Each structure stands twice: as structure tokens, then as C-alpha cells.
Amino acid sequence: MSSQDVLIHSDDPCHPANLICTLCKQFFHNNWCTGTGGGISIKDPNTNYYYLAPSGVQKEKMTPEDLFVMDAQTLEYLRSPKLYKPSACTPLFLACYQKKDAGAIIHTHSQNAVICSLVFGDEFRIANIEQIKAIPSGKVDPVTKKPMTLSFFDTLKIPIIENMAHEDELIDDLHKTFKDYPDTCAVIVRRHGIFVWGPTIDKAKIFNEAIDYLMELAIKMYQMGIPPDCGIGEEKKHLKMASP
């Protein structure tokens, strides 16, 4: 086995090389990463290597042999599959690693994200929904010193940026959202999809699932005439009356 192949072969199902393939299959079946769209990257906390899904590979068929591996310090590729090129998302993934101290980043072409980008302006907003409690607030508990999540009564805000012809051209707007929304764990790209990051792949996955649930709920609320961030008890004021 070559030194490059050692990086991607492990019997541990939670090894980044195995986990990326498992999650890509799941995301494909969730209709989030079809037609080779989307991507994922995981930082191995044991080696500080970045594992990156390649460009142009059907996500449900991805294998560890398809993955790129990069040194987090030098940003040099330690492993590059001959048949593929790096994901166009790579500069955006690196920005999340370097500026947000992410441990993993998920990029999907979720239809819910795309539709929300058409309905909302510069930011997605939803409030007073239980699932919001799965999203980090960016604050730290003064007693336990542990990260706090949003509360039921908080408003989740996710910035929306404009799409570009090429994904690497999104980098300036992504850096701007880091400054304007320092506590966000996601950014929606209009007519394109969403990027979600977290301190670990488990957290990033939870955030991504919760946000997609909330976006789907917001779309249904919008169809009913209910603003997704309306106050508790105000829902019926906005309900569209059914036709007789």
C-alpha cells in the first residue's frame, strides 16, 4: 500500500475518508447532492489533515480512493486522485477552516435553500420554532463555559449572498458574512444552495439537518401567508383563507 493510500484506508467507520463517503450517499438520498452537486470536507483532529470530496463525482458512488487529502499547515495536497480535480468549493472550505475554526463543512444544493433564497432578501429569518434550539448562538455559558445554542424565543438569521459563475468567486462575499454575521454557522447562496460548518462533523451534520428542516418549514409557512419570524399568537392574523 502506498503512502498516499494509507491516508484513506481505515477500518474505523468514523475515519474521515469513510465518513465522507457514507454522508455523501445519505445526502444524495436526501436529494441534497444529486448530479455530482455539493461537497463535504472533514478535518482529521488526529493529523490536522483536510479530507475533501472531489469535483465531478456522483456522491452515491464515492469511495475513499476518490478523496483528496491536504496538509492543514502547508495547504499542500498529500493525496490527489489521478482521475479527478479538487472541488471548486475548496477555497470556501479553507476559508471556513481558517476563519471559523471549523472541523467540517457541508455544501448541499438543497431545494429548500434555493427556494428560501428566492423568497427572502439578504437573510433567512425564522423564529419561535423548537428546532432553532439545535443551532449555535455564538455565546458561551458563563458558568459551564460551554457553547450555548439559540433558544426557542430567538430568531435564527442566516445571510444570503449572490451566486457567481464560479464557486471560488464567492470567497469575498463569504469573508464579508464572517464579519457581518460572526455567530452564523451557515450561508445561503442564492439560486445555488447552502454551506454549513461546525466544530466537528457531527455538529455540522446536526446544524445542516436542523437548518434544512427550518427552511422547509419556512417555505410552508410562507405558502400559508405566515411570516416565518412572526410573533407567537400572531399566526392566524396572517393565514390565507381557503377558497370556498
Swiss-Prot record:
UniProt GO BP: L-methionine salvage from methylthioadenosine
Cofactor detail note: Binds 1 zinc ion per subunit.
Cofactor: Zn(2+)
Reactions this protein catalyses: 5-(methylsulfanyl)-D-ribulose 1-phosphate = 5-methylsulfanyl-2,3-dioxopentyl phosphate + H2O
Name of encoding gene: MDE1
Keywords associated with the record: Amino-acid biosynthesis, Cytoplasm, Lyase, Metal-binding, Methionine biosynthesis, Zinc
Name of the protein described by the UniProt record: Methylthioribulose-1-phosphate dehydratase
Family: Belongs to the aldolase class II family. MtnB subfamily.
Pfam families: Aldolase_II
Keyword Amino-acid biosynthesis annotated: yes
Positions of Zn(2+) binding: H107, H109, H192
Functional pathway: Amino-acid biosynthesis; L-methionine biosynthesis via salvage pathway; L-methionine from S-methyl-5-thio-alpha-D-ribose 1-phosphate: step 2/6
Main location group: cytoplasm
Enzyme Commission number: 4.2.1.109
HAMAP family noted in UniProt: Salvage_MtnB_euk
UniProt keyword Membrane, yes or no: no
Gene Ontology CC, one term: cytoplasm
Species this protein is from: Saccharomyces cerevisiae (strain YJM789)
Functional description taken from the UniProt entry: Catalyzes the dehydration of methylthioribulose-1-phosphate (MTRu-1-P) into 2,3-diketo-5-methylthiopentyl-1-phosphate (DK-MTP-1-P).
List of residues binding substrate: C89
